[in-house]
Amino acid sequence: MVDLFNYRRRQSSPVKVGSIQIGGDSPIRVQSMTTTNTNDTEACVAQAERIIKAGGELVRLTTQGRREAENLKNINAGLRADGYLTPLVADVHFNANVADVAALYAEKVRINPGNYVDPARVFKKIEYTDEEYAEELKKLEDRFVPFLNICREHHTAVRIGVNHGSLSDRIMSRYGDTPEGIVESCMEFLRICKKEQFDNVVISIKASNTVIMVRTVRLLVSEMDKADMHYPLHLGVTEAGEGEDGRIKSAVGIGALLADGIGDTIRVSLSEEPEAEIPVAKHLVDYITKREGHLLVPATESAEFDWLRPERRKTRAAGGIGGSNVPVVIASYGKDENAADVEFSPDTTPDYIYCGASLPADRREGQKYIVDFNAYKGEPDTYPIFPYNATPFIGSVKADVKFLVLQLGAPSEEYLACLKAHPEVVVVAVSNQQNRLGEQRALTHELWTNGLFNPVVFAQMYRHSAAEKADFQLEAAADMGALMIDGLTDGIWLMNDGDITVRDIADTSFAILQAARLRTSKTEYISCPGCGRTLYDLRSTIAKIKAATAHMKGLKIGIMGCIVNGPGEMADADYGYVGAGPGKISLYKQKTCIEKAIPESEAVEHLLRFIEEDRKKK
């Protein structure tokens, strides 16, 4: 059972994967996947060693055919000859026979329930009687059990890896595109593992949508608990993208689950060199696990909160904050920043700027400001903020919106009475404790339990230099992940004691909100990291598409290396670019293919032309 307010890792069963253990009392493992051709032994060994030297503890390789699966033997030998004992994981799709071969040479084999026995997804609705559905499950078991026996004989671990983008038509026909269907896709295989007493299993459920990813993993954990299953979990946001956005998106999803103690191994999927994923994963793990042994957070969960199916907490809007409004962004000028010199991007300008004890001399027209309550003089578009010990003064100050800084442990009777009497007050929830998520959740649940509808803005303070901006972004995204997905967030206020600019901080705030599907400020790219199946230059293609579409705010564009998740993830994108074979690309509008197998040299131009023409019709 997850404790919302106190960090502790979920107890999972240990799984031996070659030279390491996943789950049990082992540390959270970090891993990556090669992008080289699995038939190219030398290239695979070289790239795997770069991953290992960066700190990777497992290396996954695509094995799309028998030839690739058999070459794992040579790759393994090459690594061992160089003194590396790091386990190799075979990634198998569409061909159960390949999984049988891979189990002979890899320390772990990943299979995808969406295409292990079921045919490739074509988005076809299939009507099954209960008897027919049971027959399909029997086919699955008849094929899966011999594979488990091979793995048992060769001490090979198994990952049952569900992807939202590659659910089978069978599952989709019976359950729809729902968290329940995604979880059932995994549970079908786990029930067979339990029946066969095969315990060397790791599981994963991934999606490019962080909300779906977090909610389905939570539901999976709940269903496993009911079935007395304790398999370790592999976490990841698939097709997260690259650069800052890819890191932020991964941190929102992975961080939300790690913060609840869920996760035994992680992979941060970036459309970059695979070794670049490892420092990101390690920082996330280190940042979250430092909470172990924190001071107890005494709190009671609101009876209205549902961790498995959270809905936004009901609040009464104060100005444009809370209610049905999108979460706001508050920012603060740095101590060495001159307000007149700061230029925000039009799409990421903060809704409110905190100025301390004095307003800037050159105020921006239409910009809202926050000042300390004892410096507030009722200026237009200006609002007072009160520390928790100044609640007696709130009633004497006239303003449409007032901000009150609160931390768990403040005299509750005093501030609860104040909030009840003043619906115009927005709570700014802060914490300086090791487990800030637990404290901020606890404070919000206390308001909820007491029937208060004041909006809540979560304020997070960090200490990073400009050179450490990436760490700041990861930590902020991880801290906000669960708060946003829980439906508790009416606003975000990131602060930093360092030289990261207020513009960068504002950009990060908006990126975090977009990663959680709460507020859109730019084009979103759902791009895979690539693997041995990718037969075109993924990174240069992403750069070309971004350069031509970055101004299309609100658009979601999928850029996929191959068909494994490509068509499925297109359902979450407006347009898509999917590898279809050597030098060939297929283009999609959502999940409908609009052009097949066009030459790679023409594909970006075709995509951009189609987007422009389609947008003109709207």
Residue ranges and their predicted role:
Residues 1-32, 148-154, 290-338, 547:
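N-terminal amphipathic alpha-helix/helix-capping segment at the start of soluble metabolic enzymes
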Residues 3, 56-188, 319, 331-438:
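Active-site beta->alpha loop and helix N-cap motifs at the rims of alpha/beta catalytic domains
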Residues 30, 91, 160, 203, ...:
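Conserved, mostly hydrophobic/aromatic
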Residues 38-50, 94-99, 250-254, 337-345, ...:
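Short, acidic/polar
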Residues 53-58, 106, 198, 262-263, ...:
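A structural motif
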Residues 57-60, 106-122, 259-275, 487-502, ...:
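Glycine-rich phosphate-binding active-site loops on the catalytic face of alpha/beta enzymes
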Residues 127-144, 149, 171-321, 398-403, ...:
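Catalytic alpha/beta core domains of metabolic enzymes, predominantly
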Residues 582-585, 592-616:
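Beta-strand/loop-dominated core regions that host nucleotide or nucleotide-derived cofactor-binding catalytic loops
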